[in-house]
UniProtKB/Swiss-Prot annotation:
Naturally occurring in which organism (per UniProt): Homo sapiens
Modified residues (Phosphothreonine): 13
Biased composition annotated in UniProt, kind: Low complexity: 317-332
Record function comment: Functions as a guanine nucleotide exchange factor (GEF) for RAB11A.
GO molecular function: guanyl-nucleotide exchange factor activity; protein kinase inhibitor activity
Region (Disordered): 1-58, 273-332, 362-393
Family listed: Belongs to the SH3BP5 family.
Residue ranges of coiled coil: 59-140, 169-272
Protein name: SH3 domain-binding protein 5-like
Compositionally biased region (Acidic residues): 297-306
Length: 393
């Protein structure tokens, strides 16, 4: 007899008989257990609700683009700045090494000729200052001439109508006169400055000529050293200007980045404020009556009185005697008894308090027992004109 073998599918297969492989595609898969990486793209992407899509501010995308652009620019410019600084330091070290080597070969003639080249440098700077002072003086002279022309035009306008003084022309004349005075002061200041720097330039030129006559031999020997130094100085100045420009670009990019962040923060605060202000107030549910044992407010007392009156009207159809008394006073006694019961229900937490009222009122609308029923029967026989009432609370 073939030995049975339990297989994972739950079916017993005789030994020697192969069970067909279960096709993986036929096995039902739970939608939760599906591959999280490949098919979960839709679940991984957060879908905004219609309300969030409506509240999505288009300025957010614009500010995010500005933020990304500023961040990319900061990274690129900082890389260029690091390269420029590295190049500047490398050229500085190389120039110092070459100048030291050249100076060791030439000897003491370099120190002897150094005052001459220093005087030449000062003379060149004085010459540049003289040119700037000349430009400022020319600008002041042109402004003075324009102000004088304005005064002439204003005087012609004031004198056009001799019988009437126009306040507009008078104001224009006063303004032009002030401009003439200011331009005159600026022209005089520029003239004095130009004369001062011109004297300094002449003194520097005279010193250069004197040193050139005195140190002619040392100047000739040290010329290669100072020419090489001038070349390296020019190269270093160019690289220094490039480094300064890149630093300014980095500062501007960081400023734009900060502005974009600040704008995003302001937009976020506006959206949150709009959401807080646009939320509907919490809906008020139906009013709940005060629980047993709680003191009723004025509104609850009014509701209780109306309910008692309704119960009194409904109790005309059911039979339960409220106590002996004449027929005209029965309604008044019934109303007082019902109000007493209602106040006791509102003040007392225990049902034991209601046992003493069982002779007068049935709380559940049913017969209270044989004793109370007999009493009602005897009372009903004695006084036939009494109303039969039953109150269901």
């Amino acid at each position: 007899m073939a030995e049975l073998r339990q297989v994972p599918g739950g079916r017993e297969t005789p030994q020697g008989e192969l069970r067909p492989e279960v096709v993986e595609d036929e096995v039902p898969r739970s939608p939760v257990a599906e591959e999280p990486g490949g098919g979960g793209s839709s679940s991984s992407e957060a879908k905004l609700s219609p309300r969030e899509e409506e509240e999505l501010d288009p300025r957010i995308q614009e500010e995010l683009e500005h933020l990304n652009q500023a961040s990319e620019e900061i990274n690129q410019v900082e890389l260029q700045l690091d390269e420029a600084r590295t190049t500047y330091r490398r050229i500085l070290q190389e120039s110092a090494r070459k100048l030291n080597t050249q100076g060791s070969h030439l000897g003491s003639c370099i120190e002897k000729a150094r005052p001459y080249y220093e005087a030449r440098r000062l003379a060149k700077e004085a010459q540049q200052e003289t040119q700037k002072a000349a430009l400022r003086y020319e600008r002041a002279v042109s402004m003075h001439n324009a102000a004088r022309e304005m005064v002439f035009v204003a005087e012609q306008g004031v004198m056009a109508d001799k019988n009437r003084l126009d306040p507009t022309w008078q104001e224009m004349l006063n303004h032009a006169t002030c401009k003439v005075n200011e331009a005159e002061e600026e022209r005089l200041r520029g003239e004095r400055e130009h004369q001062r720097v011109t004297r300094l330039c002449q003194q520097a030129e005279a010193r250069v000529q004197a040193l050139q006559k005195t140190l002619r031999r040392a100047i000739g020997k040290s010329r290669p050293y100072f020419e090489l130094k001038a070349q390296f100085s020019q190269i270093l100045e160019e690289h220094k200007a490039k480094v300064t420009e890149l630093e300014q670009q980095v500062a501007q990019a960081k400023t734009r980045y900060s502005v974009a962040l600040r704008n995003l923060e302001q937009i976020s605060e506006q959206i949150h404020a709009r959401r807080r202000g646009g939320l509907p107030p919490h809906p008020l549910g139906p009013r709940r009556s005060s629980p047993v044992g709680a003191e009723a407010g004025p509104e609850d007392m009014e509701d209780g009185d109306s309910g008692i009156e309704g119960a009194e009207g409904a109790g005309l159809e059911e039979g339960s005697s409220l106590g002996p008394g004449p027929a005209p006073d029965t309604d008044t006694l019934s109303l007082l008894s019902l109000r007493t019961v209602a106040s006791d229900l509102q003040k007392c937490d225990s049902v034991e308090h209601l046992r003493g009222l069982s002779d007068h009122v049935s709380l559940d609308g049913q017969e209270l027992g044989t004793r109370s029923g007999g009493r009602r029967g005897s009372d009903g026989g004695a006084r036939g004109g009494r109303h039969q009432r039953s109150v269901s609370l």
